[in-house]
């Protein structure tokens, strides 16, 4: 039996009445943005292959794209609207502060967790570097094995993916061993994996939970759909509650009320100075 959908179980700890109706988030069957969202996932599920992901690791693994601070990266996201997101049609920089502030109110004693809220989508600067959105945004999934049922648009978007014609990659386990651990899975390329690798490269001093949340927060088929358990080890199951806790704020703090970014910047600059100071390699 699959785990229950966190969107039906979890609720934000702050101002639940002010949030959008929970059942209306992540609606992939109707809504004004649906055509845009479907096109993005169709491209993603056609072209995200083992070979493609390995090439992207090689292309961006040297972190020579740009040198900038964390808040400069946040400011860059003013120019990005995520075309895979059915919930919002405003710049990602606002979502970064919304998520961070939601976590801060619910977990005032965990300053590293507040910073994760700000950092979690900064890998989307790849779009502003010229990468197509289907190679940056949206839900992630392991390549090298058959996509499982809870992947968004699973039944209607993978028909042209060449890996599904491969006798190994088209099986449930694919190129993996049972319970190999998600750290050993090759995830579809996007802002999660890029940001995780960037944080390691720049030696962020955040706890392991922060790195894990960043790397797998878009892996909805796992943390929400309950799929891909055949790849999980004990560490993954131990970390799952952290990812699900983060997901409450990633999802349910989206709204039209824009935070006062200028008022918030000094607090988050202090966290950046503590955990990831200075000019960083992106």
Curated annotation (Swiss-Prot):
Binds 2 iron ions per subunit. Its EC number is 1.13.99.1. Thermolabile. Fe cation 1 binds at residues 95, 120-121, 250. This is Inositol oxygenase. The lineage of its organism: Eukaryota, Metazoa, Chordata, Craniata, Vertebrata. Pathway: Polyol metabolism; myo-inositol degradation into D-glucuronate; D-glucuronate from myo-inositol: step 1/1. GO terms for cellular component: cytoplasm; inclusion body. It is found in: Cytoplasm. Keywords: Cytoplasm, Iron, Metal-binding, Oxidoreductase, Phosphoprotein. It catalyses: myo-inositol + O2 = D-glucuronate + H2O + H(+). Substrate binds at residues 26, 82-84, 124, 138-139, 217-218. Fe cation 2 binds at residues 121, 191, 217. InterPro entries: Inositol_oxygenase. The modification Phosphoserine is found at residue 30. One of its GO terms (molecular function) is ferric iron binding. Signal peptide: none annotated. It comes from the Eukaryota. The keyword Oxidoreductase applies. Residues 12-24 have a biased composition (Basic and acidic residues). Residues 1-25 are annotated as: Disordered. Kidney specific. Its main location: cytoplasm.
């Amino acid at each position: 039996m699959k785990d229950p959908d966190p969107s039906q179980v979890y609720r934000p700890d702050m101002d639940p009445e002010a949030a959008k109706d929970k059942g209306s988030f992540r609606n992939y069957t109707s809504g004004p943005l649906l055509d845009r969202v479907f096109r993005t996932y169709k491209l993603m599920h056609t072209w995200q292959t083992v070979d493609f992901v390995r090439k992207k690791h090689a292309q961006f693994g040297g972190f020579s794209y740009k040198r900038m601070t964390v808040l400069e990266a946040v400011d860059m996201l003013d120019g990005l609207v995520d075309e895979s997101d059915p919930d919002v049609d405003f710049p990602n920089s606002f979502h970064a502060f919304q998520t961070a502030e939601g976590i801060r109110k619910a977990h005032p004693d965990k300053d590293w967790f507040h910073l994760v809220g700000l950092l979690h989508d900064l890998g989307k600067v790849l779009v502003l570097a010229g990468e197509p959105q289907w190679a940056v945004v949206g839900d992630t999934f392991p390549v090298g094995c058959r996509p499982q049922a809870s992947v968004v648009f699973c039944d209607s978007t993978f028909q042209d993916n060449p890996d599904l014609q491969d006798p190994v990659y088209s099986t449930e386990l694919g190129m993996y061993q049972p319970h190999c651990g998600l750290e050993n899975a090759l995830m579809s390329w996007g802002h999660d994996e890029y940001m995780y690798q960037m944080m390691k490269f720049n030696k962020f001093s955040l706890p392991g939970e922060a790195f894990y949340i960043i790397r797998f927060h878009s892996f909805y088929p796992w943390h929400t759909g309950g799929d891909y358990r055949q790849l999980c080890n004990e560490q993954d199951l131990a970390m799952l509650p952290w990812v699900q806790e983060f997901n409450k704020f990633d999802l349910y703090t989206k709204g039209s009320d824009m935070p006062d970014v200028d008022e918030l910047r000094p607090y988050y600059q202090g966290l950046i100075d503590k955990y990831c100071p200075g000019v960083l390699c992106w």
